[in-house]
């Protein structure tokens, strides 16, 4: 097996917006890209894997103002928290920068000048914008909501629809409102700069680039074709925003700034340039090299920007266009979209803080991923079963059944001068290398791991057939015992090579255990030498326990989502109540129509009992006056005894969709209060109406 010719790869993930911590969707994407990068490096390829914070835009400007910080300080505070997530999940970017970097200012302006002066693709138009008469500012797209003009979905942002992926002008929204004040915005005119995406040369290029059948995933190419050939074709792209705005000022246009979606993807190039400048590499030469390959891993919600605007910008700025854009779906939890308020989210930081092995999640996500644009679903039972069965029961089990005998009986030395008649066992394992290699390269991680686990099954069958524990009982069979266990360790070594892109930390432990240098792909054909001495066996990985998943979802700040307590303990405004305790900041205003969607009802607690296996939940049987009882799980066990609640009245959200939990179906949400500062006041206070209220009465 010869090493392939090295490739030169430039790889990015979508830039996270610098207004909050990473969520599990970010981590999923970073794991997907990190696996691919690690695999490519194991092939001997040159890979530059870079990321950055998306730092510009009105949301950050407004959030910084509210926090009493400059936008730069606000972004720096967010960036300071990134490392614990990336290190925690073994995600290794070569560089992490910001779109507010000098490199991004320079490159964004240069690309704009080329589009304006050379390609003649920048034009100016007078635009009617929404203006908030209360806030006295033009409203950014994300601070306007309304009904999608294409599909009619309500509460969509002012630039694109999350339901149908349509892109439109904010003024196209039906029934718009300001998310800052709730006011109905008024229209005002302003001169804006546009990138002429509708120009025939842009359209011709995008047809070739997006629809050639050699690049984009079929689902993505079909969507691009729909956009290119839809009624009206491609529209020109508004790339400017009016002051006040935190961003990059447009050359020769005082008071005008690049829309964040222009400079954000340029951040891919800027963070690579920043990295090359720090390491003494020539950025311009690297990007001009025709052998350089450029790849972007992104979520399906930003496909339009990355498959139309971005490649067209680069093409007509005379810069390298992406070789491909790899689009993935979302991650759901038990079939539901992630939501803090419903308790269906997974906190990556919580996962790490409670001591869960990050490589469990890396493996589980990889096992679910394919090259298709499909959502992946996380369920606790499947997570436990897959990790314990595959990693512990199949993979780790091989080493645990062989290494101990080698250490105890043979001074840790393996015997590899085997009879050629038995070579088929390891040959079969090595012969799947090219198949697994191709699957990794195609991002078919789920298929790759299934193929690897099939080999693990065959190895465990070899264990059962040769029974080393029986051989160890007979002194006359020591040579056979050493050979069997040595073969098993060699098989384990090869499996570790196959799994190393997914499980880098575990692979490092195995390398130390086997007393070998870091494993590369080409080491598959090079066995441990005869007489090689391994180190004493130490336990490599523990099993997942159900109580860990309970702890993951029974987050104190969420109280299992059946209690309406704050989802953030922070108080950035420093407000206090009459007792001097910090209170959570008031949420943005909503319209009365939004509140009217929530059906709050008086409920009688007919029965209440502990939930076996949960430290936080109580099971409530509620009468809401509808002729049947409801089952609701509530995370209030720390505050109430079941017998103290039976017969009491409370308030519940009656029209919340039933949620499937580990312990059963929860048919609503009981309301309760808790302090933002749990140390000052750790209590949970269930709502209890005054005498006279009856089950079924509506609260409003």
UniProtKB/Swiss-Prot annotation:
Keyword Protein biosynthesis: yes
UniProt EC number: 6.1.1.10
'KMSKS' region, short sequence motif: residues: 337-341
Binding site for Zn(2+): 148, 151, 161, 164
Gene Ontology molecular-function annotations: ATP binding; metal ion binding; methionine-tRNA ligase activity; tRNA binding
Motif 'HIGH' region: positions: 16-26
InterPro entries in the record: aa-tRNA-synth_I_CS, Anticodon_Met, M/V/L/I-tRNA-synth_anticd-bd, Met-tRNA-synth_bsu_C, Met-tRNA_ligase_1, Met-tRNA_synth, Methionyl/Leucyl_tRNA_Synth, MetRS_core
Record localization: Cytoplasm
Gene Ontology terms describing biological process: methionyl-tRNA aminoacylation
Amino-acid positions noted as binding ATP in the UniProt annotation, renumbered to this chain: 340
Reported cofactor(s): Zn(2+)
Reactions the enzyme catalyzes: tRNA(Met) + L-methionine + ATP = L-methionyl-tRNA(Met) + AMP + diphosphate
Residue span(s) of domain tRNA-binding: 594-700
Cofactor binding: number and manner: Binds 1 zinc ion per subunit.
Enzyme class (EC, first level): ligase
UniProt keyword NAD present: no
Gene Ontology cellular-component annotations: cytosol
Gene3D superfamilies xref list: HUPs, Isoleucyl-tRNA Synthetase, Domain 1, Methionyl-tRNA synthetase, Zn-domain, Nucleic acid-binding proteins
Keyword terms of this UniProt record: Aminoacyl-tRNA synthetase, ATP-binding, Cytoplasm, Ligase, Metal-binding, Nucleotide-binding, Protein biosynthesis, RNA-binding, tRNA-binding, Zinc
Matches recorded under Pfam families: Anticodon_1, tRNA-synt_1g, tRNA_bind
Subunit structure: Homodimer.
Family designation: Belongs to the class-I aminoacyl-tRNA synthetase family. MetG type 1 subfamily.
Function: Is required not only for elongation of protein synthesis but also for the initiation of all mRNA translation through initiator tRNA(fMet) aminoacylation.
Protein known as: Methionine--tRNA ligase
Species this chain originates from: Janthinobacterium sp. (strain Marseille) (Minibacterium massiliensis)
Organism placement in taxonomy: Bacteria, Pseudomonadati, Pseudomonadota, Betaproteobacteria, Burkholderiales
